[in-house]
Amino acid sequence: MNKKTIRDVEVRGKRVFCRVDFNVPMEQGAITDDTRIRAALPTIRYLIEHGAKVILASHLGRPKGKVVEELRLDAVAKRLGELLERPVAKTNEAVGDEVKAAVDRLNEGDVLLLENVRFYPGEEKNDPELAKAFAELADLYVNDAFGAAHRAHASTEGIAHYLPAVAGFLMEKELEVLGKALSNPDRPFTAIIGGAKVKDKIGVIDNLLEKVDNLIIGGGLAYTFVKALGHDVGKSLLEEDKIELAKSFMEKAKEKGVRFYMPVDVVVADRFANDANTKVVAIDAIPSDWEALDIGPKTRELYRDVIRQSKLVVWNGPMGVFEMEAFAHGTKAIAEALAEAPDTYSVIGGGDSAAAVEKFGLADKMDHISTGGGASLEFMEGKQLPGVVALEDK
């Protein structure tokens, strides 16, 4: 990675504005999953141990530039304090006199969490005035919020124009793992692309076809490819306007010598419900009034074999409607194959795939789970991420 990190700069005695991603799921004011808070701990601990005055900033949810009481970060500050085993001060604003006074009170090794930055309309607009106000609080900017790196916001990109800007450890790890996968992968390199819609994965499929040895397709988006081969898909998810594109992807795979794997059998249901009637049918035998909601057992076995033979697997998107028990078997089989394959380095591309490995209790068996759904997707599309571009080069 050619970006400076906190290791490359002196932090002792400095006021460090550290953008983290504490956008955690909440229910009735309680945090239901603190993974994102834990992910930022190495950077925060490093700053504390090296005598920085730590100012943390994050968003939570989508308050749309207004104060939304249930999206305040008080519960986050409390949980962070428990994890760090030290008090974490919190302000009720993210800029202004109260914040300046709180920053002035910080000693070396102290931690202050600012209020939700998305309470300010200028955050998502990347307003230079707000970015300057953030920058005035500090001597150094650290971005450790890979999950928000694809957004050019005031606290992720704008602020970096006014302060020396470096990466935190989580940002560094994400860029190294994903960067190596795209630029210098161990082979055979397999990408597994699932999820509901082709349109969300066009850029990823297009970019990965230049790089992978095997491409595995599953989830709702698979049926547009099945239709492109001339098979009837019944009531399965179908994007009519993407059929030609699906054909062109299969052509491109052939030209590039990429092995393109699609379901050979599927689990179909007579309606979209966990207690629907289901059966397994061959891919060219989907009944006209049924819909395919998961990959079938033969496909699971086929995909498992490909995974076992791969040195690197990047997985983005589930194989079926894994939220429903009846249609979770395909996604679970992929997660288990990745967990069990001894020589396979597994990179889980955030979002639903990350949620799935968590759900099946296999998260600790994965080599790298990306903390950014949208960010990792855009990175795998080959796009430049504004929050990364803004950091200083080594």
From Swiss-Prot:
Which Pfam families is this protein grouped with? PGK
EC number(s) on file:
2.7.2.3
Annotated membrane-spanning segments are none
According to its UniProt entry, one GO biological process term is: glycolytic process
* Pathway as given in its UniProt record: Carbohydrate degradation; glycolysis; pyruvate from D-glyceraldehyde 3-phosphate: step 2/5
- GO molecular function (one): ATP binding
Q: Which residues bind substrate per the record? A: D21, F22, N23, R36, H59, L60, G61, R62, R118, R151
Q: What is its main location?
A: cytoplasm
Report what the protein is called. Answer: Phosphoglycerate kinase
